[in-house]
């Protein structure tokens, strides 16, 4: 289980990520909303162990060491961090990502057979920028799961590629609820999809009410 209490990330002046609490179990998809891209990215980085928190705690299966979080967690498609470079072909992207898997788990993974087994041959010759949103989400999550130690998927703004939740929500739900390999899946999004009744949280939900009130005018001015 991913358990987060009063997590915050320091910014240059104010908190980049205001105090936020949440939890996500294996077999569960949690959607976390934040208006600002920098807040969504800071959350995704902290939840996957790629950024040191300024305060609060993040634990995975009761372990608070950031190394445990990095081993279990995979950061997916974070803007300016690990989103695919637009000039890469899907085939090259797959080759590059598979090479990052620890050698003891990688075995003889090669891009061509991997693309075939995972049913991505139809997009192998495309550039990353040409990928339809749904196939992009399917591809990048499949690559994250090529590492057998991945138990936690953290997606940064999957809704930025399409206004239609059908392009990303069903895929994430299927991954979370997969009985063969139940995952904890967390997606930082702009807003909850219409009709969403599953687990949800809001960035800043653990901040003192007075602090939230003071910051509202600044957020509005920045839009």
Language-model segments: residues:
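Conserved beta-strand
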Residues: 4-7, 15-25, 56
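Conserved catalytic loops of ABC-family nucleotide-binding domains
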Residues: 149-151, 160-195
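ABC ATPase nucleotide-binding domain signature region
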Residues: 35-100
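GG-anchored amphipathic helix commonly corresponding to the ABC/SMC/Rad50 NBD signature/C-loop
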Residues: 133-155
